[in-house]
C-alpha cells in the first residue's frame, strides 16, 4: 500500500482531480513560514488498496491456520464490514466471539499502523455479531421492563465496549 501526498495552496486545489468516494484522505495545513505562504497537504490512500490488503491479511491468517476462509468486504460510510466465510466458523468465532474480536483488533491495528488513518473495521463470521446484537437488544428490553415494574436494580453480565454501547443506545 502506498500513501500518496499532494501539496497545494487551498483544499480545492489539492482535491482537484481526485474522486473523494474512492479514497481515504487527511488534510493538514502547513503553517506559513517567514517568506512562504501557507500550504495545504493531502495524504490519501485508495480504497481498493485497503480492500486488497484486507484480503491478503485474511488469506495469510487462514494459511497459518491451515484453513480456507473466503472474504466478503462491504464498504459503508465509516469503514468496512468484513464477512468471513468458512466451513469451520466456530474456530473463527471462538468463545463468546473473543477470537472474532481479536481478528478485528489485529486487522484494525495493522491497517492503522500501515496507513496512519483510523479506518473502522467490523469483522463478522456467520452473522454471529448481528445475531448477538439482536439477542442482547431483546434481553436488555426485557430487563428494562422488569426494572420498571419491580423498581429493583438489575446487574448485567460483564460486556465489551461494543456491547455496552448497544445497551446505552437502547436505554
Q: What is the role of each PLM region?
A:
Residues 1-170:
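RNA-contacting regions in translation and RNA-metabolism proteins
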